[in-house]
């Protein structure tokens, strides 16, 4: 990973397999929702949304390695985007991820609003709409996006890698900036 690298987000298919304890506590124990409750924002029942299969990115990641210079992958699981991405960022570098580059699926907003869950807690527990990150050489970003589009993966550039000194000596390895797009 080098300063200037592009951070590419690949959309999640929903909650994936993380955060169900929080979701259960908020939506069932707290808000009293039933699995068969129709949620207009979902266009289906809560149960159908929660049973959405987790997207598996292995073949997509392998395809990326054949078409562009990939420096790292980060699977966004428990711990959220910032904590998982931080695991691949070397000392001396920093990743900035701009929330304004995507809109989380309605299920994430429902968990937040129904349970008055703060954004920081949601981001530490849920993927917030990003299931996988690829860190690629900047000159390969367009090719990476084209490869993912050809494979039917919704993907976008969500950030970049900089020298940690540019972000402040005591900056975290990853900073989430801005507000989510609506």
From Swiss-Prot:
Primary residence: cytoplasm
InterPro entries from the UniProt entry: PurM-like_C_dom, PurM-like_C_sf, PurM_cligase
Any Gene Ontology CC annotation: cytosol
E.C. number(s) listed in UniProt: 6.3.3.1
Catalytic activity as recorded in UniProt: 2-formamido-N(1)-(5-O-phospho-beta-D-ribosyl)acetamidine + ATP = 5-amino-1-(5-phospho-beta-D-ribosyl)imidazole + ADP + phosphate + H(+)
Keyword ATP-binding appears in the UniProt entry: yes
Single GO biological process annotation from the record: 'de novo' IMP biosynthetic process
Family to which the UniProt record says this protein belongs: Belongs to the AIR synthase family.
Keywords linked to the UniProt accession: ATP-binding, Cytoplasm, Ligase, Nucleotide-binding, Purine biosynthesis
Molecular function GO labels: ATP binding; phosphoribosylamine-glycine ligase activity; phosphoribosylformylglycinamidine cyclo-ligase activity
Pathway where this protein functions: Purine metabolism; IMP biosynthesis via de novo pathway; 5-amino-1-(5-phospho-D-ribosyl)imidazole from N(2)-formyl-N(1)-(5-phospho-D-ribosyl)glycinamide: step 2/2
Name the record gives this protein: Putative phosphoribosylformylglycinamidine cyclo-ligase
Gene3D superfamilies xrefs: PurM-like C-terminal domain (3.90.650.10)
Cysteine-cysteine disulfides: none
Subcellular location, record wording: Cytoplasm
């Amino acid at each position: 990973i080098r300063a200037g690298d592009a951070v590419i987000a690949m959309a999640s298919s929903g909650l994936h397999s993380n955060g169900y304890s929080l979701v259960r506590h908020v939506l069932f124990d707290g808000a009293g929702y039933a699995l068969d409750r129709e949620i207009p924002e979902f266009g289906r029942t809560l149960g159908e949304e929660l049973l959405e299969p987790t997207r598996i990115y292995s073949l997509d990641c392998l395809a990326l390695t054949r078409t562009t210079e990939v420096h790292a992958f980060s699977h966004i699981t428990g711990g959220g985007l910032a904590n998982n991405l931080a695991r691949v960022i070397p000392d001396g570098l920093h990743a900035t991820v701009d929330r304004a580059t995507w809109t989380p699926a309605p299920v994430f907003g429902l968990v937040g609003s129904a349970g008055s869950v703060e954004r920081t807690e949601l981001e530490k527990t849920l993927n917030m709409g990003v299931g996988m990150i690829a860190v690629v050489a900047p000159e390969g970003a367009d090719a990476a996006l084209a490869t993912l589009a050809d494979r039917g993966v919704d993907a976008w550039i969500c950030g970049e890698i900089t020298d940690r000194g540019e972000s402040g000596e005591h900056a975290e390895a990853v900073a989430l900036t801005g507000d989510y797009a609506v």
